């Protein structure tokens, strides 16, 4: 499984319906699980992003599909980054010639 960091902002619609956010989070977890992944962490944040989630998924295509499906609801905008573990980082650096 690959790890992904998902940076999330509410849209105007998302802020207007913020009380429904916990239900949307539960739905997002189910959508990720249906794609073969798992949300491992979720944070409400202060600053540039409203929320941050950490998820594991089998591949980039699965995550792209999930993020597009969740974005279709209109309540959030996301920026997703593929993350590498420290061990993966060490392997990548070791391959530099």
Regions found by a protein language model. Give the residues of each.
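A compositional/biophysical signature of low hydrophobicity enriched in polar/charged and small residues
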Residues: 1-97
């Amino acid at each position: 499984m690959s790890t992904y960091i998902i940076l999330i902002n509410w849209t105007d619609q998302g802020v207007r319906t913020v009380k429904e956010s916990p239900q949307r989070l539960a739905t997002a977890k189910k959508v990720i699980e249906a794609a073969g992944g798992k949300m491992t962490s979720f944070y409400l944040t202060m600053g540039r992003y409203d929320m941050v989630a950490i998820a594991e998924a089998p591949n980039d295509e699965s995550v792209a599909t999930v993020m597009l499906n969740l974005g279709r609801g209109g309540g959030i905008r996301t920026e997703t980054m593929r993350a590498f573990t420290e061990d993966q980082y060490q392997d990548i650096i070791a391959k530099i010639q």
